[in-house]
Amino acid sequence: MPKLKTKSGAKKRFIPKKSGKVKFRRAGVRHLATFGKTKKQKRHLRGTDHLAPMDAKKIKECFPYAR
């Protein structure tokens, strides 16, 4: 039986962790310095976050060899 392939779109956007959570980077960060974003918005866009459990379940299906 051939190896299962990981979805290339998912591997560019998500990182499955050993704890079972899925890490991702927030959208809207490409032009953080542009006008129209408040300090609070920029602060919340910084760093990474984890997906909700139901969304994480769907994304994990894209990673056949993730634990």
Swiss-Prot record:
GO terms for molecular function: structural constituent of ribosome. SUPFAM superfamilies: L35p-like (SSF143034). The keyword Ribosomal protein applies. InterPro entries: Ribosomal_bL35 (IPR001706), Ribosomal_bL35-like (IPR021137), Ribosomal_bL35_CS (IPR018265), Ribosomal_bL35_sf (IPR037229). GO terms for biological process: translation. Pfam families: Ribosomal_L35p. It comes from the Bacteria. GO terms for cellular component: cytosolic large ribosomal subunit. Keywords: Ribonucleoprotein, Ribosomal protein. The keyword Ribonucleoprotein applies. NCBIfam families: rpmI_bact. Belongs to the bacterial ribosomal protein bL35 family. This is Large ribosomal subunit protein bL35. It comes from Anaeromyxobacter sp. (strain Fw109-5). The gene is rpmI.
